[in-house]
């Protein structure tokens, strides 16, 4: 039986056609491990699990599922430096921020995996859980490439993606059907104070 999915790019329901016959690959966004996962996080993970199970059971696809772990960002760095957020189970805190960050995020990564097991996830269904910190060099190279192509700028010691330039190339916001008229310069859309040129720009490197 053919599987039909909603294509957010074409805005139509289409028959799923794999790139390679009999195989499907899924890359889904996992947790940011600065705290325990909540019900809102888990809903997204359950949707990805439902998709991969459906592909396997209904059409017998060989599924390769990768879920990333974001183990470095503003929240993880803030919490690892907060004494009240450090738990005994994480081990002794050292003077090295990198060591502390790894201990802190590893604890919440393990807690996340324990939680999804309780929800019925099978760990052998996952191909890998790559951590963001394992790909820092690759991130740097990509950011440099983006900047060299004129789609990034530096401000306040950070590097930002220039959404306006990419939007003009008619490439940004297609999947989400963004309404750029609702982005207003100077409006706060989150709790972070950034020195970006436009409110729609997002940070690539801090």
Q: Where are the regions that the model predicts?
A:
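NTP-dependent nucleotidyl-transfer catalytic core
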Residues: 1-206
């Amino acid at each position: 039986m053919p599987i039909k999915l909603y294509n957010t790019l074409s805005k139509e329901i289409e028959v799923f056609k794999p790139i390679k016959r009999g195989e499907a690959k899924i890359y889904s966004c996992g947790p940011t491990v600065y705290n325990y996962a909540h019900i809102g996080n888990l809903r997204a993970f359950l949707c990805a699990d439902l998709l991969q199970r459906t592909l396997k059971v209904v059409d017998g696809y060989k599924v390769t599922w990768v879920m990333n772990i974001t183990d470095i960002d503003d929240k993880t760095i803030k919490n690892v430096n907060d004494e009240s957020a450090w738990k005994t189970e994480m081990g002794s805190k050292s003077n090295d921020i990198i060591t502390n960050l790894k201990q802190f995020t590893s604890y919440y990564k393990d807690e996340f995996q324990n939680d999804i097991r309780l929800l019925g996830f099978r760990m052998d269904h996952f191909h890998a859980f790559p951590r963001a910190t394992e790909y820092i060099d690759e991130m740097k190279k990509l950011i440099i490439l983006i900047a060299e192509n004129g789609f990034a700028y530096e401000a306040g010691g950070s590097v930002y993606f220039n959404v306006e330039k990419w939007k003009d190339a008619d490439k940004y916001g297609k999947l989400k059907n963004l309404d750029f008229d609702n982005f207003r310069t100077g409006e706060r859309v989150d709790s972070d104070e950034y020195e970006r040129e436009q409110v729609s720009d997002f940070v690539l490197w801090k």
